[in-house]
C-alpha cells in the first residue's frame, strides 16, 4: 500500500523497495534472548520538550505494573524517580535498550522505527504521535497490526484513554501482531539490488 499512498509519482526508471519485508532490523534485536517480565516499556524519543514522559507516567501511576521509561533529559529523570514502579533508562546503551524492549510485555512508543522493532519482538504496542510526520503513518501502523492501538494527545481525555488501553492490552490473552517483519529486511534489500545488477 505504500506505493499507492506515499509514492504516487514514481519514476519508471527507479525501483522502490516498499513494504514490510524490506524493514531493516538491527542485529542486536535479532540476537536478543530476553526473558519476559511483567513490565511496560516506554520510549518517546527526542528531547521530550512537552514533558510528555511525566504526563504519561502520571496517568499510569495507579497501574500496578513496573514501567521502564527511556529518557535523555536529566531534569525529567529526576522528576520520574518520585513515582513507584518506575525504572528510568537514562541514555541507555543500545544493548540495554534492546534487552529492556525484548523483556517487556507491552510497550508505549512514538510512531517511529522503534514501533517496527517492537513488532519484530512481538510486543503489543500503543503508539503516540508526537510530530506531524508520525500522525500520517498511524493509520497504517494500526491497519497492518504493527501496533495494537493509538493514543492522540490532542484528545483532552488522552491520559484516561491511555490507562484504559494499557490495562486492556496487558490482560488480553493473545495479540495479532504482523508476522511480516521477520528480521530479513536487509537480506531482502540486498537480494533485490543483486538482481538489478545482474
Walk through the language-model features, giving the residues of each.
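A short, well-ordered alpha-helix in the C-terminal region of glycosyltransferases
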Residues: 171-183
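Acidic donor-binding loop of glycosyltransferase active sites
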Residues: 102-113
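Conserved catalytic-core segment of nucleotide-activated headgroup transferases in glycan assembly
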Residues: 30, 36-75
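Nucleotide-activated donor-binding/catalytic signature segment of Leloir-type glycosyltransferases, i.e.
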Residues: 77-93
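Catalytic binding pocket for nucleotide-activated donors in carbohydrate/polymer assembly enzymes
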Residues: 116-160
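Short acidic alpha-helix that forms the nucleotide-activated donor recognition element
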Residues: 93-104, 119-120
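A nucleotide-sugar donor-handling region in carbohydrate enzymes
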Residues: 1-49
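C-terminal alpha-helical cap of glycosyltransferases
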Residues: 167, 182-198
Amino acid at each position: 500500500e505504500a506505493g499507492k499512498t506515499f509514492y504516487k509519482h514514481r519514476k519508471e526508471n527507479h525501483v522502490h523497495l516498499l513494504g514490510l519485508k524490506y524493514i531493516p532490523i538491527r542485529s542486536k534485536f535479532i540476537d536478543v534472548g530476553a526473558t519476559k517480565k511483567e513490565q511496560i516499556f516506554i520510549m518517546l524519543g527526542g528531547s521530550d520538550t512537552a514533558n510528555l514522559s511525566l504526563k504519561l507516567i502520571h496517568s499510569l501511576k495507579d497501574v500496578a505494573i513496573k514501567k521502564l521509561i527511556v529518557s535523555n533529559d536529566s531534569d525529567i529523570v529526576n522528576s520520574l524517580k518520585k513515582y513507584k514502579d518506575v525504572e528510568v533508562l537514562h541514555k541507555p546503551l543500545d544493548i540495554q535498550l534492546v534487552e529492556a524492549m525484548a523483556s517487556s510485555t507491552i510497550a508505549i512508543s512514538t510512531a517511529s522505527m522503534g514501533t517496527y522493532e517492537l513488532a519484530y519482538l512481538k510486543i503489543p504496542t500503543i503508539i503516540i504521535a508526537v510530530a506531524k510526520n508520525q500522525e500520517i503513518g498511524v493509520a497504517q501502523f494500526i491497519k497492518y497490526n504493527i501496533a495494537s492501538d493509538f493514543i492522540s494527545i490532542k484528545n483532552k481525555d488522552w491520559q484516561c484513554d491511555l490507562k484504559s488501553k494499557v490495562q486492556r492490552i496487558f490482560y488480553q490473552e493473545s495479540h495479532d501482531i504482523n508476522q511480516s517483519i521477520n528480521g530479513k529486511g536487509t537480506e531482502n534489500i540486498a537480494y533485490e539490488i543483486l538482481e538489478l545488477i545482474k
